[in-house]
Structure formats: C-alpha cells, structure tokens
C-alpha cells in the first residue's frame, strides 16, 4: 500500500529512474528488515483519555477479511467541520476501537440485528489527529497535511507502528481531509 500512493505521483520517467537506481544497489538478504525511518516512526498522537464521554460514535464498519468490527469516534471539532462540509481543522481527532467478531458454529462472524458483526474482544485502538506543524518532517510524497497516526494496545500504550502505511493509505483521500 505504501508504494501505491507514491507511484500514483510519479511519471513514467520517474519510475524508470527509481528502478535504475535500485538496480545498481546490493540486494538485501531474505531475512533483512529495515528500521522505520525516525520521522515516520514518531507520532505526536496521544491516547484520548475520556473519549467515551467526550467523543461521539459516528460510524461502524465490518472487516470480513480479518473478522473484525470497528467503531469510529470523533471529537467535537472534527464533527462540527464535517457537518459543515469543511476540511477537518487542527485539533481534530478520529479514534477507532478494533474488535474481533464473535464467530458462529460455522466459524463465520455473527451478525447482530443492526447488520454489523457482533463484537467479541477488544484487539487494539487506532487514532488519527492533526495539529499545526505535525507534518513538517514527513516526506511530501506521503504527507497528509499535518495528520499523524497511531495505534494503541488495549492497555492504551502506544504500539510501534510504521506511520508510512497509514500515510500512504490516506494520501489519496485529500479531498476528504485524508479520512
């Protein structure tokens, strides 16, 4: 997903130049793994304590491939801007609870009367938030204005994550405030 967002910004000549450059490089071993780039591993997003009472749930999505159901919440600033059809401003926070779906006897996710999977165990949280200057150290090809992304454990601890994956996935969504 990271390269898809970048590739859409490149011309055929750019792609040929990138391919030529990497063709001259020594290949990595099969087990090699690069460290995250520091400016993509760092996030300014904090766990929004008290979100259950200060944010509003605005969406639910089933994820059949991973047998998950996700509940989406937003703070008042984000909700007001969205309601007014405006870009989400600095101070906006979107937050997600990610649950495994309860399985039926056939192993398929159970669906509730609302059409959504029945939530089982909380797996982790994700968040995206923006403040002025947060995007300044992110390469332009991935930058989503000043949005930063984070994932948290069920204990609310920050999980190490490659923010580039989030940035790349959200990059094409510029007309919708990268959401």
Q: What feature does the model see in each segment?
A:
Residues 68-84, 108-113:
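N-terminal post-signal-peptidase region of extra-cytosolic proteins
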Residues 21-22:
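Conserved hydrophobic/aromatic "anchor" residues
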Residues 27-31:
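Intrinsically disordered, low-complexity Ser/Thr-rich linker and spacer segments
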Residues 1-15, 33, 37-41, 45, ...:
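Sequence context surrounding c-type heme c attachment/ligation sites in exported
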Residues 34-77:
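Compositionally biased, charged N-terminal/linker segments
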């Amino acid at each position: 997903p990271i390269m898809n967002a970048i590739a859409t910004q490149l011309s055929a000549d750019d792609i040929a130049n990138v391919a030529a450059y990497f063709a001259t490089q020594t290949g990595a071993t099969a087990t090699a793994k690069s460290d995250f780039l520091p400016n993509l591993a760092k996030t300014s997003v904090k766990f929004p304590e008290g979100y259950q009472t200060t944010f509003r749930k605005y969406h639910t999505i089933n994820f059949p491939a991973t047998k998950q159901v996700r509940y989406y919440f937003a703070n008042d600033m984000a909700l007001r801007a969205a309601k007014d059809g405006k870009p989400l401003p600095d101070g906006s926070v979107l937050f997600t609870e990610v649950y495994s779906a309860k399985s039926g006897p056939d192993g398929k996710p159970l669906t509730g009367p609302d059409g959504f999977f029945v939530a089982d165990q909380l797996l982790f949280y994700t968040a995206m938030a923006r403040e002025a200057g947060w995007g300044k150290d992110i390469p332009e090809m991935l930058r989503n204005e000043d949005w930063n992304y984070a994932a948290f454990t069920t204990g609310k601890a920050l999980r190490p994550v490659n923010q580039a994956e989030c940035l790349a996935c959200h990059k094409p969504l510029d007309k919708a405030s990268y959401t």
